[in-house]
């Protein structure tokens, strides 16, 4: 195993640890594509964790400077400051793919702002956040998952990322509240007459369910729009993207089956993932 292979293996471990659903799906890509996904996921995870886990703004600055070095001089030797193994893997990817570096910087800017979280006044602000933390990831992955990236390809990948982030929010309402965060907008909370603190303390009510389903309908519509345009991605990537997205959309039904609880994180079990895999395998005949 070469040193570069070890770098990619390190990135893969990060992805498997933090997102079993993504790993389950994207590990089915051809080798070069899945390695690129591992590297990009690992970079994005380190960006996310720089503040939430490490509480280290300097580490986030180092990540940004390392990415800038790769963008400017992709073939030069660099003394990376953040995580050398991840950055070497990203540099290798950047030498072969047209990486949308600005999307990395947009993600970093969102993480900077998230240090001083305040509730969103409107849904527009919420959806802007979903772009910043997840739509950006879709943009960065676009050259890996398509043969000829176009404006439409970037748009579809961006919308998929935003949809998956909204699903994350719908899954983690209680966990986020424990961390003193409510991502639903004040505008929509007022419209549906919902106080998350009250729901957390006293249990789910019809007002909360209606609010939750309002946002779930948006995520489901975006998911369907992506599925309707999935042919913008490469033949190899189409079944993988559909598998990842369908595993994620299944989370919404898991929340429903758990009676919208705020006190337990739901997940899609291995049996259901395997069922989805076989359905999509039959559809595409080539996973």
Curated annotation (Swiss-Prot):
Q: Name one GO molecular function term.
A: squalene synthase [NAD(P)H] activity
Q: What is this protein called?
A: 4,4'-diapophytoene synthase
Q: Where on the tree of life does the source sit, at the highest rank?
A: Bacteria
- Positions that bind Mg(2+) 1: 48, 52
The entry marks the following residues as binding (2E,6E)-farnesyl diphosphate 2, namely: 45, 165
Q: Which cofactor does it need?
A: Mg(2+)
Quote the function comment for this protein: Involved in the biosynthesis of the yellow-orange carotenoid staphyloxanthin, which plays a role in the virulence via its protective function against oxidative stress. Catalyzes the head-to-head condensation of two molecules of farnesyl diphosphate (FPP) into the colorless C(30) carotenoid 4,4'-diapophytoene (dehydrosqualene).
Q: Which residues bind (2E,6E)-farnesyl diphosphate 1?
A: 18-21, 41, 45, 171, 248
Q: List the source organism.
A: Staphylococcus aureus (strain N315)
Which E.C. number(s) belong to this protein?
A: 2.5.1.96
Q: In which pathway does it act?
A: Carotenoid biosynthesis; staphyloxanthin biosynthesis; staphyloxanthin from farnesyl diphosphate: step 1/5
The record's family statement is: Belongs to the phytoene/squalene synthase family. CrtM subfamily.
Question: Which Gene Ontology BP terms does the record give?
Answer: carotenoid biosynthetic process
Q: How is the cofactor bound?
A: Binds 2 Mg(2+) ions per subunit.
* Reaction it catalyzes: 2 (2E,6E)-farnesyl diphosphate = 15-cis-4,4'-diapophytoene + 2 diphosphate
Keywords, alphabetical: Carotenoid biosynthesis, Magnesium, Metal-binding, Transferase, Virulence
Q: What residues bind Mg(2+) 2, as annotated?
A: 168, 172
Q: Which CDD domains does UniProt cross-reference here?
A: Trans_IPPS_HH
**Which chain regions cross the lipid bilayer?**
none
- Pfam families, per database record: SQS_PSY (PF00494)
């Amino acid at each position: 195993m070469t040193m570069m292979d070890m770098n990619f293996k390190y990135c893969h471990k990060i992805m498997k640890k933090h997102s079993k659903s993504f790993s389950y799906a994207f590990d089915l890509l051809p080798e070069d594509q899945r390695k690129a996904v591992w590297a990009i996921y690992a970079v994005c995870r380190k960006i996310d964790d720089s503040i939430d886990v490490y509480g280290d703004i300097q580490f986030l600055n180092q990540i940004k400077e390392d990415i800038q070095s790769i963008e400017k001089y992709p073939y030069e030797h660099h003394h990376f400051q953040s995580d050398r193994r991840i950055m070497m893997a990203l540099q290798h990817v950047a030498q072969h793919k047209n990486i949308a570096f600005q999307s990395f910087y947009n993600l970093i800017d969102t993480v900077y702002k998230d240090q001083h979280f305040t509730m969103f006044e409107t849904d527009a602000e919420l959806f802007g956040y979903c772009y910043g933390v997840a739509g950006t990831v879709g943009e960065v992955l676009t050259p890996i998952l398509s043969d000829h990236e176009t404006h439409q390809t970037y748009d579809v990948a961006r919308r998929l990322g935003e949809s998956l982030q909204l699903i994350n929010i719908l899954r983690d309402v209680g966990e986020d509240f424990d961390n003193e965060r409510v991502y639903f907008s004040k505008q929509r909370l007022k419209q549906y007459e919902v106080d998350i603190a009250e729901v957390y303390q006293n249990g789910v009510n019809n007002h909360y369910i209606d609010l939750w389903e309002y946002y779930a309908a948006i995520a489901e519509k975006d998911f369907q729009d992506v599925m309707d345009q999935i042919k913008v991605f490469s033949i190899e990537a189409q079944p993988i993207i559909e598998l990842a997205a369908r595993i994620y959309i299944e989370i919404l039904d898991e929340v429903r089956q758990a009676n919208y609880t705020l006190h337990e994180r739901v997940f899609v079990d291995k049996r259901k993932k395997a069922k989805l895999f076989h359905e999509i395998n039959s559809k595409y005949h080539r996973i």
